[in-house]
Swiss-Prot record:
EC number: 2.8.1.6
Cofactor note: Binds 1 [4Fe-4S] cluster. The cluster is coordinated with 3 cysteines and an exchangeable S-adenosyl-L-methionine.
The species this protein was found in: Synechococcus sp. (strain CC9902)
Pathway(s) of this molecule: Cofactor biosynthesis; biotin biosynthesis; biotin from 7,8-diaminononanoate: step 2/2
One GO BP annotation of this record: biotin biosynthetic process
Protein name: Biotin synthase
Entry cofactors: [4Fe-4S] cluster; [2Fe-2S] cluster
Entry function: Catalyzes the conversion of dethiobiotin (DTB) to biotin by the insertion of a sulfur atom into dethiobiotin via a radical-based mechanism.
Keywords: 2Fe-2S, 4Fe-4S, Biotin biosynthesis, Iron, Iron-sulfur, Metal-binding, S-adenosyl-L-methionine, Transferase
MF annotations from Gene Ontology: 2 iron, 2 sulfur cluster binding; 4 iron, 4 sulfur cluster binding; biotin synthase activity; iron ion binding
Coiled-coil regions listed: none
Amino acid sequence: MTITTRHDWTTEEIQTLLELPLMDLLWQAQTVHRDANPGYRVQLASLLSVKTGGCEEDCSYCSQSIHNSSDVSGFEAQMRVEPVLERARAAKEAGADRFCMGWAWREIRDGAQFEAMLEMVRGVRGMGMEACVTAGMLTDDQAGRLAEAGLTAYNHNLDTSPEHYEKIISTRTYEDRLETLQRVRKAGVTLCSGGIIGMGETLRDRASMLQVLASMNPHPESVPVNGLVAVEGTPLEEQQPFEPLELVRMVATARILMPHARVRLSAGREQLSREAQILCLQAGADSIFYGDLLLTTGNPDVEADRRLLADAGVQANWQENASSLAIKAPAST
């Protein structure tokens, strides 16, 4: 099969995909995924909150906003360089080949903290790992300096559709987000950008968000697909949980639209059964966050993920064959 990469998908076409009978949608996604990702390799990415809480933004889903009253909304000091690099080393030893670092900032500001960020990026790259940063908006000069430090990717999620956006965030515009992504790309750093389902959006909103991502040329290097984790103390704390198959549909549709992007199964994975997670891998997810914490919310532990991947018959990027993932079953009696 020859994969045709398109950048002209319409919202209507994407909504039609999302509405397909599940087996038909999975078949289409599988056809693309098997061609684009022979061997079913899955990237293991580890995520660390370097600067937690005290964020000036009012994102309705976020526990780190000063506008919300969660346990982590208050300010915490930025971690120092060496402890961050120690965590990166531990992540690599556990099997991760990408280390993502998060700062709860509205925007990057020049000064000692930015210099420390650059040192962290250089340190992670020096270990032979990919380095990703998420830290809000940035300038052209800052994007250029991050590129010089060796940054692999910059994460800046769209979160939701342009139409639903103002119901979720008021302190930063959708255009601000798109301009940030343009600056990153101009500097030669790849994009990591996706969104969240389960925030009261419609199916049309989900299609619209995917349309924005799929219209980018080239497509983002990584597309995180998140399910809302309703955190106490945030405006969305009483939001009804998303249906697991809705996340499967988002993964499958993202795979069809962006054949060569890494579709990363991200926040909300703890709310999925093992079977639903394996279905997401079948639908086209080829990256997961690895480790028991994602910034401030929970994630399956390392051993559970190793067993999950082994049972699914997929392999991590750094492994030569799927059998090396196997975990011995208890001896029968």
